[in-house]
Amino acid sequence: MATTPTPIFPQTPYLKTLSLAAVTACTTRAPTATASLAAANIIEITPVSTNGRRIDSVTVSACSTAITSATVAQVVGIWAWDGTTAYLIQEITVTAVTPSTTVAAFTTTWFPSIPLVLPAAFKLFASTTVTTPA
């Protein structure tokens, strides 16, 4: 971000979504080189930004084409990529829930204890530990 004597505030709010439907399970928690991200099923959430990004929260919500499709228990991994390697920085547990017209589908939000500030040229990625249906 540009040097300034005033506090840093987001210039433009940023909201990004990513579907993990029809995604193959990631089987590693190890730092992963750029060339191996696709093979490890680690998927980009946010593109690089010249000014960096402030991430206040990450929400994981079940989605399906059927309102009563059950959630599969799994872990969603959040990865920070520094331009050469992605590092697992957070794991979000997803519990099995069978929603209905009166029961809400699974949703949870991770709020970092302090906002996650990605430096310029960093990206955020995600993965899942279970192969998900379409």
Identify what each model region corresponds to:
Residues 2-134:
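Surface-exposed, low-hydrophobicity beta-strand/loop segments enriched in small/polar/acidic residues
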